[in-house]
UniProtKB/Swiss-Prot annotation:
Coiled coil stretches, renumbered: none
Name of this protein: Lysine--tRNA ligase
One matching Pfam family: tRNA-synt_2
InterPro entries noted in UniProt: Aa-tRNA-synt_II (IPR004364), aa-tRNA-synth_II (IPR006195), aa-tRNA-synth_II/BPL/LPL (IPR045864), Lys-tRNA-ligase_II (IPR002313), Lys-tRNA-ligase_II_N (IPR044136), Lys-tRNA-synth_II_C (IPR018149), NA-bd_OB-fold (IPR012340), NA-bd_OB_tRNA (IPR004365)
GO biological process: lysyl-tRNA aminoacylation
NCBIfam families on file: lysS_bact, PRK00484.1
Organism encoding this protein: Azobacteroides pseudotrichonymphae genomovar. CFP2
Residues reported in the UniProt entry to bind Mg(2+) 1: 407, 414
Length: 500
């Protein structure tokens, strides 16, 4: 325990001995907030009495007068604390003992007073009542600013992710990211609602993981004595709802994949998936363009976004290029019609690692990921994927070896994925059986056979298009972050060893 922590615990005991509860249970009525006060104050207006609560972020004690910077949920404001105003009677202990000696930076206080403007022109609150609301036992890192420069900033990445609560306190920009994240989610939700689509909830705990090629997290249901899996995707449940008669459904889905962590992957992540009857992937491309253009204008006020040296333009239309053509464009190799052995030769020629468990689809995916994907900065639809890469997708109407699928690539990574959904139950069963063969071959991302989903398709599913957008990645783009961990409040990390 540090010297500061020991000192604060002694202050805690002293407060208790004086009959002051350092963690009172009573409601504290807050009537005003810092930004409202700064925006609404006029010197010629009647005296404005306010009640504010927040955390003490700095303090300057100058004898009988002190200045405090108070941080509430929306910003900061200066408090002017004068001994005689705070303690109008003979007993001055609240100022000289409690405020000056027993309170610390980081403590939560509630204050009442009136708003005024100092001689230096800073809107402040003249305090005449002060209540301790919560005693802080650990000192905050001190971030100093001068002439637009920040010093001693709390910028250790691992520390910021592990102690996000401290990061939110001392780094204003961090909180701004997550406020914008909420606005982005609300914008997507309102866009779907305006189209008349229904928001639904589907199971997170599943007996069969489906809807994506990914390794699931495995758990066990004790009461039923069966293995269960955390959801890797919600696709198959949303399609069941289309079978059941919903024409348009969507869900913000928390998904879990037992895979690696990097700048665009976290084991736990959020996507939004939408399924609309009587549509195809061409319609969905137009819909996706409209949605992203709308969101950018609503959140940013523009369809243009500057990230590093690039200006990304979300104004429709976006470029469309087939998977076969995009690989040829970047490698000079035309993979059309190649079998698995030929694709392995291409991988070796391009110095891409491959192993015997990889199917043709996986090999093509590796070529695209290693040699192509990262080069596409402007929004680009990669369309018409080989059949083996897309076991839930309808065959292309002009080429049975391809599927009606697209991925939207922006800033070098996948943002969205969509299909003309496969609704032929016989073809779907065969695709699942092909996946089972890949699983036996050693592909740990191959899909399970979901018999209930096949039964649902046998009742009939109308022509449907579905699309999923990685919400964390969308937030990354619109907040100009280079790592997915920056847009997750609590990104997954190796457990920390704590000693007490």
């Amino acid at each position: 325990m540090s010297e500061q922590e020991i000192f604060r615990r002694k202050s805690l005991e002293e407060l208790k001995s004086r009959g002051i509860d350092p963690y009172p249970a009573d409601e504290y009525i807050v009537t005003d907030y810092s930004t409202e006060i700064k925006r609404g104050f006029r010197e010629d207006s009647p005296r404005w009495e306010v009640s504010v609560a927040g955390r003490m972020m700095s303090r300057r004690i100058m004898g009988k007068v002190s200045f405090v910077e108070l941080q509430d949920s929306v910003g900061r404001i200066q408090l002017y604390i004068k001994c005689d105003s705070l303690c109008p009677n003979e007993n001055k202990d609240l100022y000289y003992i409690v405020f000056k000696k027993l309170l610390d930076i980081g403590d939560f206080i509630g204050i009442k007073g009136y708003v005024f403007c100092t001689q230096t022109g800073e809107i402040s609150i003249h305090v005449n009542s002060l209540t301790l609301l919560s005693k802080s036992l650990r000192p905050l890192p001190i971030v100093k600013s001068k002439d637009g420069m920040t010093y001693d900033s709390y910028n250790d990445v691992e520390l910021r992710y592990r102690q996000r609560y401290v990061d939110l306190i001392v780094n204003e920009g961090t909180k701004d990211i997550f406020l914008k994240r909420t606005k982005i989610f609300n914008s997507v939700r309102s866009f779907f609602n305006e189209k008349g689509y229904i928001e639904v909830d589907t199971p997170v705990l599943q007996s069969i993981p489906g809807g994506a090629a990914a390794r699931p997290f495995v758990t066990h249901h004790n009461a039923l004595d069966i293995p269960c899996y955390l959801r890797i995707a919600n696709e198959l449940y949303l399609k069941r709802l289309i079978v059941g008669g919903f024409e348009g459904v969507y869900e913000f889905s928390r998904n879990f994949r037992n895979e690696g962590i990097d700048k665009v992957h976290n084991p736990e992540f959020t996507v939004v998936e939408v399924y609309v009857s009587y549509k195809d992937y061409k319609w969905m491309m137009n819909f996706t363009e409209q949605m992203l253009e709308h969101i950018c204008i609503e959140i940013l006020g523009s369809t243009e976004l500057k990230i590093g040296e690039y200006i990304i333009n979300f104004k429709a239309p976006y470029r469309r290029i087939t998977m076969i053509d995009v690989i040829e464009e970047n490698t000079g190799v035309n993979i059309a019609g190649m079998n698995e052995n030929q694709l392995r030769e291409v991988c070796r020629f391009l110095h891409i690692e491959e192993d015997k468990t990889m199917s043709s689809g996986k090999l093509i995916d590796e070529i695209f990921g290693k040699k192509c994907e990262w080069k596409y900065i402007q929004p680009t639809f990669i369309i018409d994927y080989p059949k083996e890469m897309s076991p839930l997708c309808k065959c292309h109407r002009q080429n049975a070896e391809l599927t009606e699928r697209f991925e939207l690539i922006v800033n070098g990574f996948e943002l969205a994925n969509a299909y003309s959904e496969l609704n032929d139950p016989i073809d779907q069963r065969k695709r699942f059986e092909d996946q089972l063969k890949l699983s036996k071959k050693g592909d740990n991302e191959a899909m399970f056979i979901d018999q209930d989903f096949l039964r649902a398709l046998e009742y009939g599913m109308p022509p449907t298009s579905g699309m999923g957008i990685g919400m964390d990645r969308l937030v990354m783009l619109l907040t100009k972050q280079t790592s997915i961990q920056e847009v997750l409040l609590f990104p997954h990390m190796r457990p920390e060893k704590l000693d007490y």
